[in-house]
Curated annotation (Swiss-Prot):
Membrane topology qualifier: Lipid-anchor
Protein known as: Autophagy-related protein 8a
Pfam families: ATG8
Region called Disordered, residue ranges: 1-21
InterPro entries in the cross-refs: Atg8-like (IPR004241), Ubiquitin-like_domsf (IPR029071)
Annotated positions for site Cleavage: G117, S118
Propeptide stretches in the record: 118-122
Subcellular location: Cytoplasmic vesicle, Autophagosome membrane; Vacuole membrane; Cytoplasm, Cytoskeleton
Induction: Induced by sugar starvation.
Gene field: ATG8A
Keyword annotations from UniProtKB, A to Z: Autophagy, Cytoplasm, Cytoplasmic vesicle, Cytoskeleton, Lipoprotein, Membrane, Microtubule, Protein transport, Transport, Ubl conjugation pathway, Vacuole
Keyword Heme: no
Length: 122
């Protein structure tokens, strides 16, 4: 997995300090970094850092991402966490607890095509 540009431009200590400050100030919010997959043909997102309500579902967050990149309804978008498609109905808080980075942020990547993951169906 390619290193996040947010990770490259911000040292670990600074990211850890920022995420813990955010979690203290907003305990009901999840600090999320969203970046476009390298080879994706969808537009770039206007901002990378989001404070997401803990009770938001992945599907609702994907809707937010779609709106931020102004993607038409006819185009597909896939959001990945550690190269895996998270379940649409999963709460962002559950995804955060399972996949948060050592710096305290949850990193998500979006793409116009299913470039990474496999969808696991129970």
């Amino acid at each position: 997995m390619a290193k996040s540009s947010f990770k490259i431009s911000n040292p670990l200590e600074a990211r850890m300090s920022e995420s813990s400050r955010i979690r203290e100030k907003y305990p009901d919010r999840i600090p999320v970094i969203v970046e476009k997959a390298g080879q994706s043909d969808v537009p770039d997102i206007d901002k990378k850092k989001y404070l997401v309500p803990a009770d938001l579902t992945v599907g609702q967050f994907v809707y937010v991402v779609r709106k931020r990149i102004k993607l038409g309804a006819e185009k597909a978008i896939f959001v990945f966490v550690k190269n895996t498609l998270p379940p649409t109905a999963a709460l962002m808080s559950a995804i955060y607890e399972e996949h948060k980075d050592e710096d305290g942020f949850l990193y998500m990547t979006y793409s116009g095509e299913n470039t990474f993951g496999s969808l696991t169906v129970a």
